[in-house]
């Protein structure tokens, strides 16, 4: 089934099937990827840290492996429920500041993406997992400096106004 996956082909047939060694590999990869992503978020003092990312990824990986073990069912119900649960959990990291600015949106999306990567690891799609993980790390670690550089070179600027009452708008 996953023999088209280059990493699974390198590892061998045991990594595709659900056995003790493939379960250990999938859990280990899931924890390591999530720990690195969580470390990056925690180092910037964001709402969700390393443990949160590890737990979300681990739950997703286990949910997908459970779905794969119930091969007779037509729909992956446990992993679908995991996606919904992760969306609910990640939405709790979004806050509105006193200046009506949204805080935590990137962390929320990163948490959800980490859960999706956990699902791909649980499915045994190692190449997809590595590519998704690399893209997520690039977005979280490299793009902020690129974004700041673009803003500094831009001729546009932001103005924030606070008014005491509506009559001041006239």
Whereabouts are the PLM-identified features?
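Canonical alpha-helical transmembrane segment with a positive-inside/aromatic-interface signature
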Residues: 100, 124-170
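Small-residue-rich segments of transmembrane alpha-helices in multi-pass membrane proteins
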Residues: 55-65, 86-89, 108-121, 166
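Alpha-helical transmembrane segments and their membrane-interface boundaries
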Residues: 1-78
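Structural signal for membrane-spanning alpha-helices in multi-pass inner-membrane proteins
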Residues: 34, 38, 64-68, 92, ...
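C-terminal ends of transmembrane helices
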Residues: 33-46, 89-102, 145
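Hydrophobic alpha-helical transmembrane segments of small proteolipidic membrane proteins, enriched
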Residues: 12-14, 18, 22-23, 27, ...
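Ligand-binding beta-strand-loop-alpha-helix segment within the catalytic cores
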Residues: 77-89
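Membrane-interface helix caps and helix-loop-helix hairpins in membrane proteins
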Residues: 43-46, 70-75, 97-101, 122-127
């Amino acid at each position: 089934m996953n023999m088209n996956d280059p990493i699974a082909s390198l590892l061998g047939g045991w990594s595709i099937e659900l056995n003790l060694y493939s379960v250990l590999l999938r859990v280990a990869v899931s924890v390591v990827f999530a720990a690195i992503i969580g470390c990056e978020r925690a180092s910037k003092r964001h709402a969700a840290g390393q443990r949160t990312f590890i737990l979300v990824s681990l739950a997703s990986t286990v949910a997908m492996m459970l779905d794969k073990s119930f091969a007779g069912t037509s729909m992956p119900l446990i992993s679908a429920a995991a996606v919904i649960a992760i969306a609910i959990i990640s939405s709790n990291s979004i806050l509105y500041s006193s200046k009506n600015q949204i805080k935590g949106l990137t962390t929320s999306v990163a948490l959800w993406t980490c859960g999706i990567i956990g699902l791909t690891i649980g499915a045994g799609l190692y190449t997809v997992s590595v590519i998704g993980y690399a893209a997520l790390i690039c977005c979280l670690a490299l793009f902020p400096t690129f974004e700041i550089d673009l803003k500094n070179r831009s001729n546009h600027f932001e103005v924030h106004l606070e008014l005491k009452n509506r009559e001041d708008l006239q």
